[in-house]
């Protein structure tokens, strides 16, 4: 990885660790959403205007099939936020690991008034670290992840850790833990 990017990541982690709690200057994230047709929408993040996201539903649910569904973006955001924190912290601490893949699963009720029961993130890592080091990294990554912190207040969040192809730990947080 380019050394300038590594330094940006390290500075971000260090700066974030120094923010007092509660944050005296919380950020506001804005996304402008434009209806296109039926259930198709275009979203533009205010702080990243160079990107456009298309959100839709499959045809069998009345959409035009021009983009992932809202729930897919939701789950993707949950998983990648946590993944970013694992990688940022591993880079910052020079932990000798790499991520080979991640699988996110959401268990939810499709009833009116239903909601998520559990969100499971399976993280597959390769490297020469101890289980204790991996657990420490996971604790830090979860604490740095805004989405994980928010979701664990209302739903069971499970992180399954795999190291060098072997399941080594299950971590859970949430209202039922």
Task: Label the predicted regions.
Residues 75-83:
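Compact, glycine-rich, soluble single-domain proteins
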């Amino acid at each position: 990885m380019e050394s300038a990017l590594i330094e940006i990541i390290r500075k971000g982690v260090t700066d974030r660790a120094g923010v007092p709690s509660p944050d005296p200057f919380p950020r506001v994230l804005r996304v402008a959403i434009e209806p296109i047709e039926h259930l198709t929408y275009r979203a533009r993040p205010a702080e990243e205007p160079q990107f456009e996201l298309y959100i839709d539903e499959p045809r069998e649910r009345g959409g035009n099939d021009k983009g992932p569904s809202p729930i897919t973006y939701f789950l993707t955001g949950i998983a990648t936020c946590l993944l970013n924190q694992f990688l940022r912290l591993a880079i910052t601490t020079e932990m000798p690991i790499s991520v080979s893949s991640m699988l996110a699963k959401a268990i939810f009720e499709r009833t009116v008034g239903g909601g998520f029961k559990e969100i499971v993130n399976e993280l597959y890592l390769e490297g020469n670290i101890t289980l204790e080091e991996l657990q420490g990294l996971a604790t830090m990554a979860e604490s740095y992840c805004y989405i994980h912190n928010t979701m664990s207040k209302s739903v069971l969040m499970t992180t399954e850790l795999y190291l060098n192809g072997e399941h080594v730990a299950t971590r859970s947080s949430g209202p039922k833990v």
